[in-house]
Amino acid sequence: MSEDDPRPLHIRRQGLDPADELLAAGALTRVTIGSGADAETHWMATAHAVVRQVMGDHQQFSTRRRWDPRDEIGGKGIFRPRELVGNLMDYDPPEHTRLRRKLTPGFTLRKMQRMAPYIEQIVNDRLDEMERAGSPADLIAFVADKVPGAVLCELVGVPRDDRDMFMKLCHGHLDASLSQKRRAALGDKFSRYLLAMIARERKEPGEGMIGAVVAEYGDDATDEELRGFCVQVMLAGDDNISGMIGLGVLAMLRHPEQIDAFRGDEQSAQRAVDELIRYLTVPYSPTPRIAREDLTLAGQEIKKGDSVICSLPAANRDPALAPDVDRLDVTREPIPHVAFGHGVHHCLGAALARLELRTVFTELWRRFPALRLADPAQDTEFRLTTPAYGLTELMVAW
């Protein structure tokens, strides 16, 4: 990308890397997002230490959003304030602590252990479909776009007969290529489905996340909170994992000498997954942080109410982390990264994400040891309208 790219600086990418102008922006700099009446000025942090400081200090920085009447349906936004009740990223301690505690029954070690066989099954089902389709095939269509949604539906507790419809609603109301009106309509339908599902779970709690929270907290977990929990889980676990699968396979096929890491023991595979997560960093940035008071950050004077955007891809390529931080090396000791956030808002589903990715990559190369790009000369098309970075297509052969 170039400086002529109209997209906000913090989401610009070039191939598998953050854009050069993003990496060159400096530890903390002023950026303008939008134009005309919609233009907003923010601070943007790119240095790893600064990003950790901002995300880790809830005393000086808040995630509470500043709402605008235009955020109502029909304006520039999709989610209304009432629809973000239960979204942990929109709360600070102690309210955040109270809500996160309610959500933890859905992410216990026992729950993750129960999910493992299902994840392996769904991955192999999708690989079966790809194999039946024959070589070459689009790995995005058969695997990357299918596995995350199936895993999330199982986690949340969506009935199997409803899952295709549920994922269409989930994807549709986030699709920036659709009109605001269409996205809003899909969002309302998605919301109504969630409330109906929550009502069923209250009568007869299932084994999914909603059932686990209802069984533990009953009416102390409100319908609005449960809906917000579901929305956040789907936002965090769908496009992010889909993007990681597609980009991860592309990265490994460009570095075939490193694929053996997924043919060894579980520890080697997990180390490889963590390096891919750092190197690719598909989420652009977490919720902007709002300064609670005047303060100095990275030598800059930040005023109370100023917004700070943290660029996660840039932070994870900070040369301060390692002299060869721009090189993919899945055998190296893990480099500390912020792809899952930091502080009280560190991703609750990080263990599930790692398990899912490890299963996909391990099973893929176990079953398709000769996997390769169908046409190495073909240009790669990246997704630019989804909440996380990814690929629109990845044609592979075997």
From Swiss-Prot:
A Pfam family that the UniProt record links to this protein: p450
Record pathway: Antibiotic biosynthesis; vancomycin biosynthesis
GO annotation terms (biological process): vancomycin biosynthetic process
Matches recorded under InterPro entries: Cyt_P450 (IPR001128), Cyt_P450_B (IPR002397), Cyt_P450_CS (IPR017972), Cyt_P450_sf (IPR036396)
Enzyme Commission code(s) on record: 1.14.-.-
Binding site for heme: 347
Entry keyword annotation includes Signal: no
Keywords: Heme, Iron, Metal-binding, Monooxygenase, Oxidoreductase
One Gene Ontology molecular-function label: oxidoreductase activity, acting on paired donors, with incorporation or reduction of molecular oxygen
Cofactor: heme
Role of this protein: Involved in the coupling of aromatic side chains of the heptapeptide of vancomycin.
Assigned protein family: Belongs to the cytochrome P450 family.
Name of the protein: Cytochrome P450 165B3
Organism: Amycolatopsis orientalis (Nocardia orientalis)
